[in-house]
């Protein structure tokens, strides 16, 4: 594949990466911050997510209504989100709207007003968001389990923060964190589609200078100490729930680990699609669950393999036993060549289909820069996936699926449901 990616770093530290996609009349533009919830202190837990919300409330040049009208006029898709390791603001527009879209995004990121009244209103909105999570059993179990799995570590804290922390985010605290951490040195601008790299560099240089440049701080590599995952057995009883919700987890290769490709493929074999082992054993053959699967979350310095299932409380024991049986099967038997080739084909097809999307490409440019510090081409990723062998999957399974590292979380009307370490023996 011809790689049409260009990369420029301005004197103030801001990075601009573009990928020209011939034949398009659209551009996906993103401004990404090298900061997420894992960079926050306990007292500031949730502040990146809070800033993600509040930059929409107005800037020195635009009111919140101005932002909404301008976004609608551009006709594009506007999105913003916070993860553990980054915060992102993206917009997909026609190529003729690129300059206006960049001006809008840059204005929001560089010059937000943070008026006290707006902050107080958004605190209420985010607290309602927290309540919504508590009313969504699988998400609620995820937060409870995360806290137990990553104890006393930023990865174990909720991205949206807590009622106590969010309520403390006044103008001084919010503006201070924004000035220090949302500075140009911590920003990555990406664009994919019908985009001129030189034009975007000019736009970025014009928007992020003066005050924003003066406030720039050196990028810290401190993302907290590497986490030491626990192996909790967490059983939370909630009688009003109709379903029981189950999580089984274990450490997994990080986003930077050499085994990340083998780990991704092994997770797909176990629970990555409708042909996967878990889906077939639990849903298709026995009808025990509507939602069941497995996946891997990869952070910069750790990873987590997770099985999730929702089932009736009286079927939870059987679902747990079937899930553990599949992990034991990976450790004691070899994954077949046919299974490996199937998930390779699935992964490669997903990559190739994603190349048609400017949004997928712009997001990949940002994540690779922030997590890896370099461009990783689709060809390189495909080659690494194709090089994975059955022996690699067996080795990863034996290394990570161990009794002492396995963790479990369950939520629901769980009277009589008991799990001890011996039951989790692999």
Which sequence ranges carry the predicted segments?
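Acidic/histidine-enriched alpha-helical segments
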Residues: 73, 112-130, 196, 216-228, ...
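C-terminal hydrophobic structural anchor segments
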Residues: 341-385
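Short, polar/flexible loop-turn hinges at active-site or ligand-entry regions and domain interfaces
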Residues: 57-61, 110-117
């Amino acid at each position: 594949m011809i790689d049409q990616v260009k990369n420029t770093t301005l004197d103030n530290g801001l990075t601009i990466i573009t990928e020209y996609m011939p034949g398009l009349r659209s551009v996906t533009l993103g401004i990404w911050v090298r900061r997420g919830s894992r960079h926050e202190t306990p007292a500031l837990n949730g502040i990146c997510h809070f800033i993600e919300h509040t930059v929409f409330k107005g800037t020195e040049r635009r009111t919140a209504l101005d932002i909404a009208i301008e976004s609608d006029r551009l006709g594009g898709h506007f999105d913003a989100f916070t993860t553990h390791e980054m915060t992102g603001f993206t917009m997909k527009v026609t190529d003729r709207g690129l300059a206006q879209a960049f001006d809008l995004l840059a204005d929001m990121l560089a010059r937000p007003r943070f008026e006290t009244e707006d902050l107080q209103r958004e605190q209420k909105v985010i607290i309602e968001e927290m309540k919504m999570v508590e009313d969504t059993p699988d998400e609620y179990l995820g937060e409870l389990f995360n806290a137990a799995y990553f104890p006393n570590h930023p990865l174990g804290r909720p991205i949206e923060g807590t009622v106590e922390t969010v309520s403390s985010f006044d103008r001084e605290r919010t503006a201070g964190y924004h000035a220090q951490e949302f500075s140009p040195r911590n920003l990555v601008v990406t664009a994919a589609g019908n985009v001129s790299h030189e034009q975007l560099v000019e736009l970025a240089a014009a928007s992020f200078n003066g005050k924003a440049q003066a406030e720039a701080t050196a990028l810290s590599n401190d993302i907290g100490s590497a986490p030491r995952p626990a192996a909790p057995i967490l059983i939370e009883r909630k009688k009003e729930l109709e379903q029981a919700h189950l999580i089984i987890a274990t450490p997994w290769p990080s986003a930077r680990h050499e085994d990340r490709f083998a780990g991704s493929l092994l997770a797909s074999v176990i629970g990555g699609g409708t042909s996967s082992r878990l889906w077939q054993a639990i849903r298709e053959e026995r009808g025990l669950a509507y939602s069941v699967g497995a996946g891997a979350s990869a952070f910069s310095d750790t990873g987590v393999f997770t099985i999730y299932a929702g089932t009736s409380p009286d079927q939870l024991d059987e679902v747990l036993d079937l899930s553990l049986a599949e992990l034991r099967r990976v450790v004691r038997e070899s994954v077949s060549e046919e299974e490996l080739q199937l998930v390779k084909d699935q992964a490669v097809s997903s990559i190739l289909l994603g190349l048609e999307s400017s949004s997928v490409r712009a997001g990949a440019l940002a994540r690779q820069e922030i997590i890896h510090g370099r461009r990783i081409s689709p060809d390189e990723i495909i080659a690494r996936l194709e090089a994975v062998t059955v022996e690699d999957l067996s080795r990863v399974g034996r290394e990570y699926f161990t009794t002492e590292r396995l963790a479990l979380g369950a939520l629901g009307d769980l009277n009589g449901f008991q799990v001890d370490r011996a039951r989790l023996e692999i």
